[in-house]
Each structure stands twice: as structure tokens, then as C-alpha cells.
Amino acid sequence: MKVEDFDFDLPEELIAQTPLLDRTSSRLMVLDKESGEIKDQHFTDIISYLNKGDALVLNDTRVLPARLHGIKDETGAHIEVLLLKQKEGNAWETLVKPAKRIRKGATITFGDGALKATCLEELEHGGRILEFSYEGIFYEVLEQLGEMPLPPYIKEQLADQDRYQTVYAKENGSAAAPTAGLHFTEELLAQISAKGVEIIFVTLHVGLGTFRPVDVEDTQNHKMHSEFYRLTEESADRINKIKSAGGKVVAVGTTSIRTLETIASRHDGKLIAESGWTDIFISPGYEFQAVDALITNFHLPKSTLIMLVSALSDRTKILAAYNHAVEQQYRFFSFGDAMFIH
């Protein structure tokens, strides 16, 4: 299929720049993936679509405050570093600006010297392998010195960095939030659990590649970025039992879907305990083996994520739903409203 087939007109004012005061006060569009019927509801109405014996699968990754501002020791030049992926030990793959100032062997100091870095290797496109030195626990130092790397379409400063974390975020490693989960509060999850729905966690660390535009004309030529995922034995067993008993598996976010479908596609539809890297690209024609329904936000035109949701329903129904969302002034993207495809 052509990438252009997934385009739609989106007024810039519908791109949500800040989160709502209450996580659960966002709107919810409900789409029947077979009939295309659309209902406009509130996010708390999601409870009525979840039944006893279903599984609600959430991604418990935690966004790192991965943007650091430092000084090149040799010259005093200001350097911005964005952490991308942890390598061995204290080495990280990073994006450095301006990259030309940081060559192999250069050193950078952050804050009052609590964190230092040495360039081990130069990569293309501004990438650098940096080795960090510090006292204490790295993630605690990062919390003190780092900034949250918000998506490029969000222009406003975030007053409360916790609003770009889910309430159940636990596993450090993401460069971006699994934004479908931002709508849930602990109270709402407790209400869902009390109904007999099983709350199950997976981990997928979202990479910055999630914001990278698709730069090919035909979808079959697109190469996905890879992201680290983990599914525990307990979570795998619980989901398998629910599916065997006829319960539905409802994924919260495209990251949860990509985790489950990566594993199921390798093991004849069954889920097993597994961790690794996935570059699965889900687009129309893909046959889902693990997931029945999806809670997600509204995605960018011509993105791999709108292709994924089109695979769960179909392209014409999704684009009709998106056009309806524009007409009804839904809020789009990371801090926007939600959609339930079932």
C-alpha cells in the first residue's frame, strides 16, 4: 500500500499541547472494527466495554528524563545529549548536539560534576557512544539533572513531568511515554479490577524512532526501528489462560500490541516468557494472534501507528473515524483523547 493512503487533514489547533487536569476527563471514541459504527463517549466509559474474564494489558515502561545539558570540558561549549539506548555497563548510545564538537575522547560535565561522560565512538547522524561516570545510582542522578524529552509536536513546557508518565510506570528505559496509558488513574484501574478484569503488565521501551516520519512511498519498503521488550512467565500464563477461557485481550497502546504480537507470531499464537528486540511492522493484511481490542490515542498522518490501527479494523473505517474526530474537535496525539477499537 502507498503511505499516502494513510494521510488525513489535521488542523494544528487539535494537537494537544498540555495534558488535561484530570487524566480520566479525556474523551473516548469507540469504534466497532467490523461495522465501523462510531460512538462518542468519555474515557471512564471504558469500564462498560470490559467484562469479567477479560485481560487489560498495559506497558509498565518508565520514561527517562533523557535530555541532558552539559559543558565540553576542553572548550566550555554547551552540549545537549539525548540518551537513546543503553549498551554494556555505563555506555549509552546517544544523540549529541552539536555533534561536530564531540569527537572520540572528548569529555562532558553535567550539572555540578555529579555526572561526566567520555565519547567512546562516533556514529552517523550525530550519534555518539558515551560512557558515563557518577556516584550512586545512575537513574537517581538522571532524575536530578535530566529533562523529559517531549515529542517534537509539543511546543509548550510541561509543568509537571509526572504527567508524561503513566501512574503504573516502573521499568526505566523509554524515550517516550506509552501515551494510551496516560488516561488511567489508580482509582480507575481499581474499578476495572473489581469488575473481574485482569490487569496484566508487559514492558516495551519506546524509542525515538516512534516519531520518525516514514520516508518511503510504499509501506512494504519501510524498515521499523527496533525496541526492547519483555514478557514475564506469569503475564504470559495469565493471558494464555484468559484466551483459552474465551476472554478478550485488550491492549492499552500500540506498544502493548507490538509486544504481544511479536511473541505470538513466533510461537503459533501462544505467549511465552521472552525478552529481546522487536522491529515488528503491523499494517493492513496482518493477522492478529494475541490481541482482540485496543485502547489508543489518535496518531499522526502517514505514521506507522495509523497503519497499525488500520490493520486492526481497516483503512477506510479508521480514516472515517479520524475525519469524525476532526469534525468533533477531538484532541490529538500524546496528550490527546483516546480511541477504543473493538
From Swiss-Prot:
Is DNA-binding given among the entry's keywords? no
Give its localization: Cytoplasm
Where in the sequence is the signal peptide annotated?
A: none
Q: How does it assemble?
A: Monomer.
Task: Please name the HAMAP family in this protein's record.
Answer: QueA
Q: Which NCBIfam families match?
A: PRK00147.1, queA
Record-given protein name: S-adenosylmethionine:tRNA ribosyltransferase-isomerase
